[in-house]
Swiss-Prot record:
Family: Belongs to the class I-like SAM-binding methyltransferase superfamily. RsmB/NOP family.
Composition bias type Acidic residues, residue spans: 64-79, 90-123
Keywords: Methyltransferase, Nucleus, Phosphoprotein, Ribosome biogenesis, RNA-binding, rRNA processing, S-adenosyl-L-methionine, Transferase
Phosphoserine found at: 580
Cell compartment(s), UniProt: Nucleus, Nucleolus
Protein name from the UniProt record: 25S rRNA (cytosine(2870)-C(5))-methyltransferase
UniProt-annotated stretches for the region Disordered: 1-132
Taxonomic lineage from the root: Eukaryota, Fungi, Dikarya, Ascomycota, Saccharomycotina
Principal location: nucleus
Gene Ontology CC, one term: nucleolus
Amino acid sequence: MGSRRHKNKQAAPPTLEEFQARKEKKANRKLEKGKRPSTTQGDEVSDRKKKKSKPFKKSRKEEEEVVEEDKDLPEVDLEELSKARKSLFDDEEDDDEAGLVDEELKDEFDLEQEYDYDEDEDNDAHPIFSDDDDEADLEELNAQNMEALSKKLDEEEAEEAEEAEMELVEAENMQPRADILPTEEQEEMMAQETPNLTSTRTRMIEIVKVLENFKTLGAEGRSRGEYVDRLLKDICEYFGYTPFLAEKLFNLFSPAEAMEFFEANEIARPITIRTNTLKTRRRDLAQTLVNRGVNLQPIGSWTKVGLQIFDSQVPIGATPEYLAGHYILQAASSFLPVIALDPHENERILDMAAAPGGKTTYISAMMKNTGCVFANDANKSRTKSLIANIHRLGCTNTIVCNYDAREFPKVIGGFDRILLDAPCSGTGVIGKDQSVKVSRTEKDFIQIPHLQKQLLLSAIDSVDCNSKHGGVIVYSTCSVAVEEDEAVIDYALRKRPNVKLVDTGLAIGKEAFTSYRGKKFHPSVKLARRYYPHTYNVDGFFVAKFQKIGPSSFDDNQASAKEKETAARKEALEEGIIHSDFATFEDEEDDKYIEKSVKNNLLKKGVNPKAKRPSNEK
């Protein structure tokens, strides 16, 4: 069966050479037939037919033997046999193929068959799927209608994209969404089990999607606050923040951007160096470091002295160039306040919180070692690193001093420009110091802004408003908290009407907030600039620039640090820190804490707080 089917298969078509040979042979035969007489041709054909028509005759003995054998064999029903054959092999086409065998073989090997290739070429010229109709619909492209056709194509693409987006949104809306928030029973089980960070991260991503489109994706019976509370719990569990700090940072952004901010804080910022232009140029320094096996590139167009280090075959803080003072390791965000300060040559400038000296030495380099730079820091131990960097970088116009910055201008005043990089909570540099996640409390965001306000007022009073090009104060922090940034400069604008905020002149940065959680700030606060790790790949930073337009009162200039502290505390009590917006005080609750604190102090001294005290003791 298999061998017969194999033989019935049609062979491969003849090659071009074989076909040409057959065609020539056929033509020769026609010529030979034309030369032969017709009678002879007819006789040969008839003889051939006669020979073919004569059957082969068997002898009588053979016929008798065949008949006897047929009698001995049982009778076979051919129809049943054929049905059984079909059912066994399931080959219904065998009969049809058997009838076509002779014709196929004849077509394959008949040399007299003629192929009409002209007709095939005509058929190929008219394919089934033709683009003639589409080409007819299109207009002829020329210089006049090119713009119109291009616009039409753009509109069609926009419509298709919009339809696809609508279909996607409808599909999401129609598809039932599982409830993301766990039930109370599930939360109890989660509290007992080991935290699964993978499922926590997945849940955070899903909650952010819901919060971004709460009207459509929010589950029935669930409020937005429930989603936010669950997200904050997951942030504390996944990233390791305290609930207080997580909520404070979360409120600065939209849910999606807040997640980007938290993710960026898990990654350290790139290593950056600042070229010391007092000793070299950035191009020369880059070439030298590349020759030493350092992979680097310029930070960006906004700075002409910064280089970003990707990897190095040598310790970047111990190269001969580093020891010679050709560069200093400095965060890119620390360049920003000095660029905003824009120091000029032959000016008197004060850096109120100078250690470890990155900004001070940058100021000296921009002044080309002219004028005078006062580098002050209240912490005497930190002045050691300040002095070391000043000497290594070759700054000869710098004076190091160790004063409480609130003593200015009583100590010395009349500066052309002042840079105040105020001490802060460090919420912008969590990538460097992960301890900030758990070390900062609500108390820190009350005490630190209180100090920052006093320092900023002292800086304003220490600047000479009659300076030819100066009268500038730059306030900066490495914090992203509103209490330390917008609230402080808004306070300064209210307390010192002789200053105004001006443009920082920085090429990058986001506008500061003019309102935050119901608190309205001065409209000019938007001139200040904010920097986030997830937007510019720098540490979180805040920069504001003031211009002094009038003199301060005599009392403000002569006040000491203690007097300023007393005045600030009095103002804080009157205003409730920031007009009672960020912190409220309850006297009854405070009295309880005060009484408890007094008892604890007495117990530490070994005194029984319940015992009656003598009348002469207070």
